[in-house]
């Protein structure tokens, strides 16, 4: 256990356009080298594309996509008696959100569209409909946990 006091969590202000804290966090995940204006342009551009392509409310599509991507269980390596076991553990809510956002960003980066806002829009639409690379990452994580269920008694 750490001897120092716990560092308080910084409160993130909601984004100006939609008033969503989750979206503001995602902008921070997309941001590179402290360029928040660029990150905002990418995310808002992607949300405009989502609205144009689906005709649905973009913030709802974003929330649905994030909720679909959030992992419930993951595996952690645990060394027991000279052997490494992949032990399935439940993911804490804060980490769930962080992983979902990171996976969404990485999946969007790897897509083939021309600009990042188009890639992100495509990945958001796919994830909200239960498909795409980010959803595959979640399914793979769950499969790993399911396959290693036998080692769940090593949980610490």
From Swiss-Prot:
Disulfide bonds: none annotated. One of the primary rRNA binding proteins, it binds directly to 16S rRNA where it nucleates assembly of the head domain of the 30S subunit. Is located at the subunit interface close to the decoding center, probably blocks exit of the E-site tRNA. Pfam families: Ribosomal_S7. The keyword Zinc does not apply. This is Small ribosomal subunit protein uS7. Keywords: Ribonucleoprotein, Ribosomal protein, RNA-binding, rRNA-binding, tRNA-binding. Gene3D superfamilies: Ribosomal protein S7 domain. GO terms for cellular component: small ribosomal subunit. InterPro entries: Ribosomal_uS7, Ribosomal_uS7_bac/org-type, Ribosomal_uS7_CS, Ribosomal_uS7_dom, Ribosomal_uS7_dom_sf. GO terms for molecular function: rRNA binding; structural constituent of ribosome; tRNA binding. Part of the 30S ribosomal subunit. Contacts proteins S9 and S11. Belongs to the universal ribosomal protein uS7 family. One of its GO terms (biological process) is translation.
């Amino acid at each position: 256990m750490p001897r120092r006091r716990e560092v308080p969590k910084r409160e993130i202000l909601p984004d100006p356009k939609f008033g969503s804290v989750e979206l503001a966090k995602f902008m921070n995940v997309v941001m590179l080298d402290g360029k928040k204006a660029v990150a905002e342009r990418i995310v808002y551009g992607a949300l405009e594309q989502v609205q144009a392509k689906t005709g649905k409310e973009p913030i709802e599509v974003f929330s649905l996509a994030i909720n679909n991507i959030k992992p419930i269980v993951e595996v952690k390596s645990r060394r027991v008696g000279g052997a490494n076991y992949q032990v399935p553990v439940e993911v804490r809510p804060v980490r769930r959100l962080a992983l979902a956002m990171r996976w969404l960003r990485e999946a969007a980066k790897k897509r083939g569209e021309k600009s990042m806002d188009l890639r992100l829009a495509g990945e958001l639409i796919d994830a909200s409909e239960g498909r795409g690379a980010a959803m595959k990452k979640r399914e793979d994580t769950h499969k790993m946990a399911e396959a290693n269920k036998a080692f769940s008694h090593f949980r610490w």
